[in-house]
């Protein structure tokens, strides 16, 4: 897009983003114990007839490499009565609309909306959640039926994909809330990081809880699969 002469005060220069984003990714990986081994950063600027054209946003890709056994890579089929579990951090006004905001021009939304869409990292909580998942995978019998990360759309996306066509009911009063000013929509749709959604066999819940306590990872049983092919969130007052 056309680069104007005035840059919004909340924006960073491409150079700052290239340096700080790269440093931030490797810093998080080191804190978490997962080295950053590949990635790239890219920006572009071009002057033509006294007008400057360039990327409004810098592109950064980063990643690591891992492996898993075939047994632990294939998801199981949800059955009625499976427990829906969330492991990790609380809900905050973080990452709201992150998937949408990242796909439009900078400045399209208000600064408040764009700030709420920005992610905040917590490497320690990520490590705790990771330790629980790894411990369960390394057991002789893996009690995890299915697992999903909390990406775009938060609980709405994660938990609905966990229960799949089996259907499920989520008790919103069981979801951990770190900011009491959150609305119901913000609670179920925020993208606060360092959380995993798991589908656990009912008889294994207490065992999983002990593993989570050992790793100091907050664990919440927030609902269960229903078998009625419907997915719903229910508030404390019974409203769905």
Residue ranges and their predicted role:
Residues 113-152:
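Polyanion-binding loop/helix "lid" in catalytic or ligand-binding cores
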